[in-house]
């Protein structure tokens, strides 16, 4: 397992290269702008790679009614274009949603 910590706003080409040319990737978006992180890097995922983002709920109303997690910073409406354009499907969300994470896998 290789772990890389990068400033995502200064290293897009370097991070893209790690995703494209590396093995299976689990990309965790948990910085100050999760929407930008998700939308920037999801396009580089390979088949069966996984992307997750924290402080997530499918919608504001879902979050208000369930409050599994105290903070909401990213919801489906923020990433729907990336989900559709990059062929992402939900993956193990029954588990991850409880902890405020979305989880998508590239088909």
Summary of predicted features, one role per range:
Residues 1-107:
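S-adenosylmethionine/decaboxylated-SAM
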């Amino acid at each position: 397992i290789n772990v890389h910590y990068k400033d995502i706003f200064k290293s897009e080409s370097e991070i893209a290269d790690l995703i494209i040319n590396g093995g299976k990737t689990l990309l965790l978006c948990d910085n100050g702008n999760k929407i930008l992180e998700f939308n920037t890097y999801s396009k580089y995922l390979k088949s069966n790679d996984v992307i997750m983002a924290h402080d997530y709920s499918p919608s504001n109303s879902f979050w208000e009614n369930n409050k599994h997690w105290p903070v909401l910073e990213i919801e489906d409406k923020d990433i729907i274009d990336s989900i559709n354009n990059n062929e992402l499907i939900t993956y193990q969300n029954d588990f991850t949603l409880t902890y405020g994470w979305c989880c998508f896998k590239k088909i």
